Amino acid sequence: MSNTRLTLFFTNIFQLLDSKIQNYSINFPIKILLLLLGFFIATVLATVFGQTGDWDVLVAGILVAMIEILGNKMYSKKYISKKQVFDISFLSLIGINYIKIGLIFGLFVDAFKLGS
């Protein structure tokens, strides 16, 4: 195959996509497990505390505060500047962030279930 600009362009695009896919596939099963754990926690919280109706506002306030504090920690300059692959505190923050994403998604889906 000749090395035209078009073939070089597509070769570079495919190499970039391959490197991105391999980068995201690291610990993929653990990430999915943490997302599902967050989804399960959201379902449990909505079911248990939603039965009485008295605790809804308090639990929602605690969850929003927890999500905001975690987001502040996750995206602060301290952690962004020293993203090291083997830093235990950063890896645990990433894991908790995946649980947080699952929690938000679970509450979002539960709100749609209640609305229909």
Swiss-Prot record:
<keyword id="KW-0150">Chloroplast</keyword>
<dbReference type="GO" id="GO:0009507">
    <property type="term" value="C:chloroplast"/>
</dbReference>
<dbReference type="InterPro" id="IPR007572">
    <property type="entry name" value="Uncharacterised_Ycf20"/>
</dbReference>
<protein>
    <recommendedName>
        <fullName>Uncharacterized protein ycf20</fullName>
    </recommendedName>
</protein>
<comment type="similarity">
    <text>Belongs to the ycf20 family.</text>
</comment>
<keyword id="KW-0934">Plastid</keyword>
<dbReference type="Pfam" id="PF04483">
    <property type="entry name" value="DUF565"/>
</dbReference>
